[in-house]
From Swiss-Prot:
Protein name (Swiss-Prot/TrEMBL): NADH dehydrogenase [ubiquinone] iron-sulfur protein 5
Function comment: Accessory subunit of the mitochondrial membrane respiratory chain NADH dehydrogenase (Complex I), that is believed not to be involved in catalysis. Complex I functions in the transfer of electrons from NADH to the respiratory chain. The immediate electron acceptor for the enzyme is believed to be ubiquinone.
Subunit organization: Mammalian complex I is composed of 45 different subunits. This is a component of the iron-sulfur (IP) fragment of the enzyme.
Transmembrane segment boundaries: none
Length: 106
């Protein structure tokens, strides 16, 4: 038992928020990766860690991609590099509002 239990004093359960996104959320909004986590938990529930690691790999990989967005960021960086290359070669001119020369907005 902690010396000063702030979570209990204020009625918060922060540990639950940090471990499972499927838990009750403070403003009743589903987290971004709730569906992927739910699929992974449903797949892995009751079969053990070793079997779950093999049999639920697809669900786990989807969940981790949703959390970390590594593939998405790699794709965005590839698109950005290609755009910069085309600009450098003179084959592409970005619109004025992309380079800060557009009309001012109210």
């Amino acid at each position: 038992m902690p010396f000063l239990d702030i979570q209990k004093r204020f009625g918060l359960n922060i540990d639950r928020w940090w471990t499972i996104q499927s838990a009750e959320q403070p403003y009743k909004l589903a987290p971004r990766c709730h569906a992927f986590e739910k699929e992974w938990i449903e797949c892995a529930h009751g079969i053990g860690a070793i079997r779950a690691e093999k049999e639920c790999k697809i669900e786990y990989d989807d969940f981790i991609e949703c959390l970390l967005r590594q593939k998405t960021m790699r794709r965005v960086n590839a698109i950005r590099r290609q755009r910069d290359k085309l600009i450098k070669e003179g084959k592409y001119t970005p619109p004025p509002h992309h380079i800060g020369k557009g009309e001012p907005r109210p």
